Amino acid sequence: MLKGIILSSSNTVINHSMNNISAGVFFYSETTKRFLYLLRNDNKNPGNWGIPGGKIETDETLLEGLQRECIEEINHFPEHAKLVPIQKFVNNTFTYHTFFCKVSDEFTPVLNDEHCGYAWVGNKQYPKPLHPGLFSTVNFDVVQKKLKALTKKRS
């Protein structure tokens, strides 16, 4: 069950009959102004950097699946997370949702066997090589504008 999650879009169970659904999240530290990236260790794009996330199961909502994936991959999901949709990418085989989540400070992720490292890095200073899909996302102008707006210091 999701506790304390705020989202600006619907949280309904998704019809998986047409596409596979995946979701990922950019965790951003307010204190250090850096984003969390994970180094892949498995047979899907090994040695590439990505963000926490993965495939949503057929009986899960988008947010339930994202929360489960984060707990599995980094053993962390903020109790009162405010998730902001950044991008929705659709092709013939899958739909991938990318979210932004501000955390007060960096945390040390407890990695599962899918990942062998992590790094907190500044925007546009991402580690290389990035997962091909994430590379496209972070180099998309609209995404960069959204990230810039979301990471601006609020007075």
What are these regions (language model features)?
Residues 2-7, 11-35:
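Conserved N-terminal beta-strand and adjoining loop/helix that marks the start
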Residues 44-47:
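A conserved beta-turn-beta hairpin within the catalytic core of GNAT-like acetyltransferases
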Residues 50-51:
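A short gly/proline-enriched turn/hairpin at secondary-structure junctions
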Residues 54-143:
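Unchanged
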Residues 153-155:
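Short acidic DE-rich linear segments
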